Design a protein with these regions (language model features):
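Sec-dependent bacterial lipoprotein signal peptides
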Residues: 1-14
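Exported/periplasmic ABC-transporter solute-binding proteins
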Residues: 16-55, 75, 106-109, 117-296
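Short, conserved beta-strand segments within well-ordered enzyme catalytic domains
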Residues: 35, 61, 80-83
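Central regulatory/effector-binding core of bacterial HTH transcription factors
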Residues: 57-71
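Short beta-strand and adjacent tight-turn residues that come in two discontinuous sequence segments
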Residues: 65, 83-86, 91, 177, ...
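Pocket-flanking alpha-helical
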Residues: 68-99, 204
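Periplasmic N-terminal soluble interaction domains immediately after the signal peptide in Gram-negative
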Residues: 100-104
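Basic (Lys/Arg-enriched) interaction patch that binds polyanionic ligands
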Residues: 114
Length: 296
């Protein structure tokens, strides 16, 4: 009788002896809690809805919060899975090495940060030099009130790291708590410029998206080496013509093939990537073909 067979028998007898033993979730059944960057709420709500329609015994409960808190949850065992805008960094991987855990992460899509202004604001077309000047406070052409969702959000980190290159945000920069509140504030203040995740304004079939885009103007940007001013739309995100581009990742630490693994696999599958495509992000795990239209 080999060791593998003995181990299997031990598991069976243990389960029979203790009928109240906690049942582990599987790739398609059970309940898990995940932490998700709040800029992705519309997208991930839709992904979960589709996944649970395919697997009715699966129950994924998301908590939407700032990205900093998502990684904190992953490190302190409050969440097995997080959905965020960056991969694990070297410090985080070193931590998992020390505790003998092998995390799994994957780029799912290319996403974008969108800038929105009041509908009465004439400055809805900007060069990247102007954006940098607004975000670090060096642009003195006019008064701007910058509004983010949260001081610990991924959009704040993105602007500080990728646009300001470590320079601080100007004094008076505001945090409005949520992306919808950013949009609401901008709609009521003519000098405001809001920084949000593009998935809040990218689904043209969603009534909430339509309401948001009717309230504010989405800023068109010109990349440093570009010639056209473009919005944060799927084609321009994919080609890199839209300059405020970032990734969408899952990070998973699951010691067995449980529901986190099942949901992660789904997100990278055809069905999961189709939802990403419908939200006008650029899928990283499937091909997107753009065809020229002949208008007559």
């Amino acid at each position: 009788m080999n060791a593998v067979y003995l181990a299997a028998l031990t598991i069976i007898f243990t389960a029979c002896a203790n009928p109240n033993a906690k049942k582990l979730d599987t790739a398609t059944e059970g309940t898990i809690h995940i932490s998700v960057d709040e800029t992705y709420k519309p997208l991930i709500d839709s992904e979960i809805k589709v996944f649970q329609s395919l697997y009715p015994q699966a129950h994924i409960i998301p908590t939407y919060k700032p990205e900093v808190e998502c990684f904190r949850d992953l490190l302190n065992d409050s969440a097995r899975m997080v959905i965020v805008t960056r991969d694990l960094n070297a410090e985080e991987r070193d931590y998992f090495d020390k505790v003998k855990i092998v995390p799994n992460s994957l780029l799912l899509a290319w996403d974008a940060v969108a800038l929105v202004v009041n509908r009465s604001n004439p400055d809805s077309v900007l060069k990247m030099d102007q954006v940098r000047g607004i975000m670090d406070g060096s642009n003195k052409d006019r008064k701007w009130q910058i509004v983010f969702d949260n001081a610990n959000s991924s959009t704040v980190r993105y602007i500080k790291d990728s646009i300001n290159k470590g320079k601080p945000l100007p004094p008076g920069t505001m945090a409005a708590k949520t992306n919808p509140e950013v949009i609401d504030y901008v709609s009521k203040n003519k000098d405001a410029i809001g920084v949000i995740g593009v998935s809040w304004i990218s689904d043209p079939s969603d009534s909430l998206t339509i309401d948001f885009t009717n309230k504010v103007t989405v800023v068109k940007l010109r990349a440093d080496y570009g010639s056209d001013y473009v919005g944060p739309y799927q084609y321009y995100i994919g080609t890199g013509a839209y300059p405020l581009k970032r990734g969408l990742f899952y990070c998973l630490k699951e010691p067995y093939h449980g529901l986190g693994t099942g949901f992660a696999t789904f997100l990278g599958s055809y069905e999961g990537q189709l939802v990403i495509k419908q939200f006008r992000l650029f899928p990283a795990r499937s091909n997107v073909v753009f065809r020229e239209a002949n208008l007559k």
